[in-house]
Amino acid sequence: PYEKIGAELVKEVAKKTDDVAGDGTTTATVLAQALVHEGLRNVAAGANPLSLKRGIEKAVEKVTETLLKGAKEVETKEQIAATAAISAGDQSIGDLIAEAMDKVGNEGVITVEESNTFGL
């Protein structure tokens, strides 16, 4: 039963990450698995679960604060292309995404669909 709860938790973390960020599901899954594993290990060793939860929440706040301090605005078409290329692992896809974003603007919507036809 505990394994199923853990699996459902990790699945929910991946889904939420995909819904909110659209990327980072692997990282979120690895972090969730580590938190569950270490949390259970600490509880088994006698740690108070509520104290662990509070500690995790404080750590999340600190990590969020640190990430936000180091975050940089992506504003130019070149920055968008570079960021998208890293995410896609392909510079040509990064360039296509930057071009699409340039055309639709900040409030526009871009829909990407998988195709079985090469080049279309």
UniProtKB/Swiss-Prot annotation:
Its main location: cytoplasm. Its EC number is 5.6.1.7. It holds the Pfam family Cpn60_TCP1. The keyword Transport does not apply. One of its GO terms (biological process) is protein refolding. GO terms for cellular component: cytoplasm. SUPFAM superfamilies: GroEL equatorial domain-like. It is found in: Cytoplasm. GO terms for molecular function: ATP binding; ATP-dependent protein folding chaperone; isomerase activity. Together with its co-chaperonin GroES, plays an essential role in assisting protein folding. The GroEL-GroES system forms a nano-cage that allows encapsulation of the non-native substrate proteins and provides a physical environment optimized to promote and accelerate protein folding. Belongs to the chaperonin (HSP60) family. PANTHER family: 60 KDA HEAT SHOCK PROTEIN, MITOCHONDRIAL (PTHR45633). Forms a cylinder of 14 subunits composed of two heptameric rings stacked back-to-back. Interacts with the co-chaperonin GroES. This is Chaperonin GroEL.
